[in-house]
Amino acid sequence: MSVALSNRFQGGKAFGLLKARQEKRLEEINREFLCDQKYSDEENLPEKLAAFKEKYMEFDLNNEGEIDLMSLKRMMEKLGVPKTHLEMKKMISEVTGGVSDTISYRDFVNMMLGKRSAVLKLVMMFEGKANESSPKPAGPPPERDIASLP
């Protein structure tokens, strides 16, 4: 049954188990980062790692522990910054160092904690600010008459 889980896109108990396993895997990687001396001077590291885990799980659409090109495309569209295929391939290459076509959680955390400025990092950092400043209008659009049209 576990072999078929990764290929089925459904909710319910199977999806909950899949997400629980994914969260456990990401939590283990977070513990590795917390124990790593390289990141010991990083302030608010546990809070940052928890936020990174949430974002990563949100955009890991295939639940395989990697963000692929289509997941990245959806993420950028959701953030209001659509990119071309070529731009997204370049972003993935920058994050992974050209080694892979997908972004693993380790690569994602290294990018977010790293010193170099990645496009994806900037988008992720400012996502919250952009969402707060421009709330989407609710309800039906206002009525217009012919005189108000251009």
From Swiss-Prot:
Residues recorded with modification Phosphoserine: S2, S134
The EF-hand domain, residue ranges: 47-82, 83-117
Single GO MF descriptor: actin filament binding
Region: Disordered, residue numbers: 129-150
PTM sites of type N-acetylserine: S2
Known partners and oligomeric status: Homodimer (Potential). Monomer.
UniProt protein name: Allograft inflammatory factor 1-like
Organism: Mus musculus
